[in-house]
């Protein structure tokens, strides 16, 4: 018995691979891990609640993930993977997390073989931050999962610096 792909769209997805393996929304960022079924020649489009396109860029063929930053907390975004003619290959609505407290938090999680680091509850007067793993500066998406101390150095507009640190549990 061969199921009819027209009746079972999941059959096609299972055969060809999923477009998106993981989708993680933070407060100000969105992490998308692309599956085997993703068209790496596609274009990522992110629009806000008013329909304004805030991100439009080609996928990075070198990486199997995309990180979208500088989003607004507590906002619903329409995320789509488009062909070059703007035909929709995949779409979803994602709401960024709301700011829930007054104190900055350092969070990490493992997503599809990557360490995803999130800085939550950052106030508006933050000018920059650096994330370090065992003293070495890293990106907030990191392939190296072998570390012990994760640190964030948050610099405020008045020049003050705050250090957040956590021990990585295996």
Language model regions located:
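Exposed beta-strand and adjacent loop surfaces of beta-rich binding modules
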Residues: 17, 29, 41-43, 76, ...
């Amino acid at each position: 018995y061969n199921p009819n792909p027209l009746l079972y769209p999941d059959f096609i997805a299972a055969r060809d691979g999923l477009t998106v393996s993981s989708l993680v929304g933070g407060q100000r960022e969105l992490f998308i891990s692309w599956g085997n079924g993703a068209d790496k020649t596609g274009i990522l489009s992110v629009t806000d609640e008013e329909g304004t396109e805030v991100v439009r860029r080609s996928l990075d063929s070198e990486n199997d993930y995309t990180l979208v930053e500088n989003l607004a907390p507590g906002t619903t975004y329409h995320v789509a993977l488009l062909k070059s003619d703007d035909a929709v290959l995949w779409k979803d609505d994602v709401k960024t997390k709301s700011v829930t407290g007054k104190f900055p938090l350092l969070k990490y999680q493992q997503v599809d073989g990557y360490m995803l680091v999130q800085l939550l509850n950052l106030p508006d007067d933050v000018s920059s931050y650096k994330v370090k793993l065992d003293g070495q500066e890293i990106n907030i998406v990191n392939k190296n999962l072998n570390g012990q101390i994760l640190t964030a150095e948050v610099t405020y507009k008045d020049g003050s610096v705050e250090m957040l640190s956590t021990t990585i549990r295996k």
